[in-house]
């Protein structure tokens, strides 16, 4: 039996000259249907925001194609709509890949929901409809290997669509997958990005100055979030595994009758005690249900490092990650367990 309790704290900081997007709650309107078409009346509650600037290759310059997005929310979900203009829709690069593959054209939305300039939750969707997600820590320090943790795999929903203007995407993100404070009216950090594959071009909503010290601390602001109710997250993933072994029976031996059966079970659970305190629980875990590790052969005396993907060990694992000198070191390597 393994139990983990994770807590969070929220910080306040002064408002800078960053961009501000103001969202609105869906009150009387029906929530958007996630079909990628952007036709639901709820989207009319708020305007699009745009004016993206290049991050690569020509920082600060106008991108080849502009991008728009808007955000609405209700008491359980936050909804994001993207409009990605493209003068040559047939040239949009759509590549299927595994989760977190980031192949072809894609867009990303990231929320610093604690407004602490240190951590953020990132959601990416490719033009082909492939999802990617990362938990960002350490202010998104690109020099640290573990600042962008793609082993974080929350539950959320998305759909994309292509038309004569380019391509669109809709995202539906449960508030239970995010961590935020208890203030009646909240300010979150906000960043949106687009990757235009044909030009290997990245553009951003909140422009970053050259050599800006950090990533999350340079986010814009998301305002208009009012009366967000604490989400009592409850996720239970039970499993049952059966095994049947057959062999040649032995006459007169009741213990060798030709077959043996085995039954095994357990569960993983994530329970939200409060909105910023989560209990992770695993009982008799079957770690064989997680993605298989890539094949590797060790020809020296050093242990091979494998990425952690087991749900129990993923939550807030950056606590045990430290940078010493020019390297990234783990005080605790969870893959030695199980």
Residue ranges and their predicted role:
Residues 1-8:
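Hydrophobic h-region of N-terminal signal peptides that target proteins for export
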Residues 9-338:
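Structural preference for beta-rich elements and adjacent junctions enriched in aromatics
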């Amino acid at each position: 039996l393994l139990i983990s309790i994770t807590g969070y704290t929220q910080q306040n900081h002064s408002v800078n000259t960053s961009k501000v997007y103001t969202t609105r709650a869906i009150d009387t309107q029906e929530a958007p249907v996630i079909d990628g078409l952007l036709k639901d009346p709820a989207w009319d509650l708020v305007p699009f925001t745009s004016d993206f600037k290049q991050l690569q290759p020509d920082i600060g310059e106008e991108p080849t194609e502009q991008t728009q997005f808007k955000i609405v929310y209700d008491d359980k979900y936050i909804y994001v709509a993207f409009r990605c203009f493209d003068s040559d829709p047939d040239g949009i690069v759509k590549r299927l890949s595994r989760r977190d593959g980031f192949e072809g054209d894609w867009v990303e939305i990231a929320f610093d929901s604690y407004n602490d300039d240190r951590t953020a939750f990132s959601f990416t969707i490719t033009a082909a409809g492939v999802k990617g997600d990362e938990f960002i820590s350490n202010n998104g320090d690109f020099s640290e290997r573990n600042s962008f943790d793609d082993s974080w795999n929350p539950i959320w929903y998305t759909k994309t669509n292509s038309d004569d203007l380019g391509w669109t995407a809709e995202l539906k993100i449960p508030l239970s997958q995010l961590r935020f404070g208890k203030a009646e009216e909240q300010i979150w950090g906000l960043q949106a990005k687009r990757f235009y594959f044909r030009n290997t071009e990245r553009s951003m909503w909140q422009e970053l100055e050259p050599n800006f010290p950090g990533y999350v601390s340079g986010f814009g602001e998301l305002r208009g979030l009012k009366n967000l109710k604490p989400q009592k997250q409850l996720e239970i993933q039970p499993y049952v595994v059966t095994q049947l072994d057959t062999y040649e029976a032995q006459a007169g031996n009741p213990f060798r009758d030709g077959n043996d059966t085995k039954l095994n079970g357990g569960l993983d659970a994530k329970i939200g005690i409060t909105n910023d305190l989560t209990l992770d629980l695993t009982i008799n875990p079957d770690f064989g249900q997680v993605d298989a590790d890539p094949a590797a052969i060790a020809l020296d005396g050093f242990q091979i490092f494998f990425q952690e993907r087991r749900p129990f060990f993923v939550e807030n694992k950056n606590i045990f990650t430290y940078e010493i000198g020019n390297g990234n070191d783990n005080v605790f390597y969870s893959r030695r367990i199980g």
